[in-house]
């Protein structure tokens, strides 16, 4: 044959020697993925009895959610498709937050593949759109649940609300640095956006085809939303100018400020100095917590890059003022300290070091009664011992970082606050469980 002639001159290859015991080919269990199986699944056995997901369900099942259930239109003996139970959606987002899942699409995929989420769902199918809408639509509920949970922990004696600590963290906004525009550029973009909206409206009216109309209408909606964002950015520019003028009147430095810019992606975001020393679009998340127990008492979101002057707004929103209030040096403001002193709150905040090397604990001529008491308090050994508990509140931010609260996926201050409330309530559930076990 041709093959024999082709390889006739090659040397003979040595054949593998067969062992004397003739064991043969090894037998192994290999996957067969084209087979069809019928399995009996016990959903409750998917997770262990001490699994974290059961803690969140035990918390949710005991809540009064009538304010959400009353909105459901599908009723007994009436037509209509029943929606997903609000209790289930609440539990899904609480557990997902503790696992660092902040995307509705990712959560919807996990509900199909991950045992813990499948156990929560219990055979109920969920979609990402419902999950995303629920996450942003229940801010009032989260505020109430946070307050009720803190009150329950205080009533049980697990936390002491007489001493609170405040700390802030900058969280990266969902906006790029290139989206910040000056006033002239915003005006030019607004004219272009309005012209595009008018053109698309005319095209929609002229095209009789339904499919073409839908495409044109979608393009018109996108152009209209862009025009609205540019208008919001112009309003943000006016706010920035007013804030700069107010600061210049209080503390003139003689320097000509740079021309302000606002983002067309998220007009409420501001460029702030981050923890690594860089400047990026971000929000300032303020957290008031029980000093030492890592329990969040209140949260607030603002777009001010400095913590100075943010102590009083946080104290004003607390239902009951604490006896002691611990903050870091960035919150040190004489006006806030005087106001807190008038309300019976002792502020523990390290004074800023003087450029001239003078003792910051010595009284000064323009000090009020509150500032004088604060300097004496922080200069004493007892005051320094009280202040040591403040550093524990930073563990809350570290925990949130581990849960992937590094860059926001939503835009606007209201939605950012909703996301922060999810993190705060999740933190309190886990820390409250820890405190109860340690008691």
Language model: regions and residue ranges:
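A ubiquitous short alpha-helical element
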Residues: 24-28, 75-79, 381-384
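Basic, short loop/linker segments at the boundary and entry of helix-turn-helix/winged-helix-like folds
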Residues: 47-94, 99
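Anion-binding and metal-coordination hotspots
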Residues: 1-14, 100-112, 124-439
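Short, compositionally biased low-complexity segments
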Residues: 25-35, 118-121, 201-205, 371
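Short, flexible loop/hinge motifs at secondary-structure junctions
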Residues: 1-44, 57
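Bromodomain acetyl-lysine reader domains
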Residues: 114-116
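A general alpha-helix detector
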Residues: 42, 88-94, 130, 148
């Amino acid at each position: 044959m041709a093959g024999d002639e082709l390889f006739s001159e090659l040397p003979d290859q040595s054949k593998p020697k067969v062992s004397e015991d003739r064991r043969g080919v090894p037998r192994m269990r290999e996957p067969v993925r084209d087979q069809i199986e019928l399995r009996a699944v016990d959903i409750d056995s998917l997770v262990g009895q001490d699994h974290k997901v059961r803690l969140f369900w035990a918390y949710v099942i005991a809540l009064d959610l009538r304010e959400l259930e009353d909105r459901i239109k599908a009723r007994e003996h009436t037509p209509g498709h029943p929606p997903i139970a609000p209790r289930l959606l609440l539990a899904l987002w609480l557990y997902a937050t503790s696992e660092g899942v902040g995307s509705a699409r990712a959560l919807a995929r996990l509900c199909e593949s991950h045992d813990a989420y499948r156990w929560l769902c219990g055979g109920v199918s969920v979609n990402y759109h419902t999950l995303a809408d629920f996450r942003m639509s229940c801010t009032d509920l989260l505020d109430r649940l946070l307050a009720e949970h803190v009150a329950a922990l205080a009533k049980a004696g697990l936390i002491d609300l007489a001493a609170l600590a405040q700390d802030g963290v900058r969280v990266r906004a969902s906006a790029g640095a290139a989206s910040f525009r000056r006033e002239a550029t915003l005006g030019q973009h607004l004219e272009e956006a309005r012209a595009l909206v008018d053109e698309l409206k005319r095209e929609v009216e002229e095209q009789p085809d339904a499919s073409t109309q839908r495409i044109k209408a979608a393009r018109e909606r996108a152009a209209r939303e862009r025009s609205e964002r540019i208008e919001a950015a112009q309003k943000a520019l006016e706010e920035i100018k007013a804030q700069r003028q107010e600061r210049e009147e209080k503390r003139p430095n003689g320097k000509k400020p740079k021309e302000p810019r606002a983002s067309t992606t998220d007009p409420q975001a501001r460029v702030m100095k981050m923890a690594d020393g860089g400047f990026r679009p971000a929000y300032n998340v303020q957290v008031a917590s029980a000093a030492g127990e890592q329990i969040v008492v209140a949260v607030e979101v603002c777009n001010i890059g400095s913590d100075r002057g943010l102590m009083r707004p946080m104290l004003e929103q607390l239902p009951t003022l604490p006896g002691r209030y611990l903050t870091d040096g960035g919150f040190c403001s004489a006006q806030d300290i005087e106001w807190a002193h008038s309300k019976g709150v002792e502020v523990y905040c390290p004074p800023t070091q003087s450029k001239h090397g003078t003792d910051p604990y010595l009284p000064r001529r323009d000090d009020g009664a509150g500032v004088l008491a604060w300097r004496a308090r922080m200069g004493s050994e007892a005051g320094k011992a009280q202040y040591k508990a403040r550093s524990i509140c930073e563990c809350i931010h570290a925990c949130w970082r581990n849960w992937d609260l590094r860059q926001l996926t939503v835009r606007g201050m209201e939605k950012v606050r909703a996301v922060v409330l999810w993190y705060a309530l999740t933190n309190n559930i886990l820390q409250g469980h820890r405190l109860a076990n340690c008691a």
